């Protein structure tokens, strides 16, 4: 834990101070243009997080900018909200790893085909190109290929568990809102990645026994768990840097409390018929995206931010 804390702090300080020295006023002016309205900030946060596939990493970068004085807290809030939406894109990308084609277009889009093609292109860019930009693109493509292959392997390993009574009982236990939320928070805090937890849920869904009632509370807790590395990175930051991390946590806590109270209160009255619906990887990705977009909309509507 101490190593992780020191690493997060080092990344934050080196990145923020280094960018300020290299780019100076130009980067500061660029950041202002891209975040001078809340909508622009949300769009920037969504775009950046979609590329790097980590809301925590995006927020750590933002904390570095705020800590070095290149960005004001008011500008950072929009990016943080957008990061919560952008991280849900990974779930949709992972859906590709569950395409099991036997012929035609489905076979072309299968995990094995996509992973192989992407890996080959990545290796060529990594080995043959001299420019660092091309090499970095190659690294991204290799990482994507490994991610797809890993998800397919994990799904294959989890699939036989559907016949295990112990595994079935465990998933049923997650339908308890409190237990499910705590599992989502704890699991994401350990993995330090909301996308990884969503990926694990998608892998569990291939067993055919993961229901909406078990998946929903876990998804609710994912955002709060993802705040752990962000809070760690804020240790040693100045006042505004710490407040930036706190905004991230407050937004996710607000979404967790708001939607859990509304959903389970209404369910107690009307008894939703989809609670026992079997979840698929696409359904998990959709649930995660809808929850995050709804949270951002609710936060924007209530203007839940720290005073600047």
Predicted regions and their residues:
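Single conserved hydrophobic/aromatic residue that forms the stacking wall/gate
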Residues: 1-7, 303, 308
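Membrane-interfacial segments at transmembrane helix termini in multi-pass membrane proteins
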Residues: 238, 263, 267-273, 283-287, ...
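Membrane-embedded alpha-helical segments of transport systems
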Residues: 51-56, 77-93, 111-118, 147, ...
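Membrane-embedded helical hairpins/re-entrant loop segments and their flanking transmembrane helices
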Residues: 19-47, 61, 66-67, 199-204
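Hydrophobic alpha-helical transmembrane segments of multi-pass integral membrane proteins
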Residues: 37-61, 177-200
């Amino acid at each position: 834990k101490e190593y992780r804390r020191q690493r997060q702090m080092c990344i934050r300080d080196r990145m923020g101070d280094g960018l300020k020295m290299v780019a100076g006023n130009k980067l500061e002016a660029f950041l202002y243009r891209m975040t001078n309205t809340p909508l622009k900030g949300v769009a920037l946060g969504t775009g950046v997080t979609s590329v790097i596939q980590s809301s925590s990493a995006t927020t750590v970068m933002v904390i570095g900018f705020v800590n070095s004085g290149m960005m004001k807290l008011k500008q950072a809030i929009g990016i943080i909200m957008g990061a919560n939406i952008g991280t849900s894109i990974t779930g949709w990308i992972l859906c590709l790893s569950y395409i099991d084609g036997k012929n035609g277009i489905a076979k072309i889009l299968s995990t094995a085909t996509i992973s192989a093609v992407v890996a080959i292109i990545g290796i060529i860019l990594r080995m043959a190109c001299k420019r660092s930009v091309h090499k970095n693109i190659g690294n991204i493509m290799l990482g994507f290929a490994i991610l797809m292959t890993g998800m397919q392997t994990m799904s294959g390993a989890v699939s036989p568990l559907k016949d295990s009574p112990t595994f079935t009982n465990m998933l049923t236990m997650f339908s308890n809102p409190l237990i499910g939320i705590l599992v989502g928070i704890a699991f994401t805090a350990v993995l330090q990645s909301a996308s990884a937890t969503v990926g694990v849920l998608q892998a569990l869904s291939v067993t055919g026994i993961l229901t909406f009632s078990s998946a929903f509370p876990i998804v609710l807790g994912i955002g709060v768990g993802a705040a752990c590395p962000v809070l760690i990175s804020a240790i040693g930051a100045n006042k505004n840097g710490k407040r930036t991390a706190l905004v991230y946590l407050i937004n996710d806590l607000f979404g967790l409390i708001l939607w859990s109270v509304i959903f389970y209160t209404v369910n107690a009255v009307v008894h939703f018929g989809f609670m026992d619906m079997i979840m698929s990887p696409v359904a998990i990705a959709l649930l995660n995206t809808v929850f995050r977009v709804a949270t951002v909309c609710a936060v924007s509507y209530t203007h839940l931010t720290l005073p600047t």
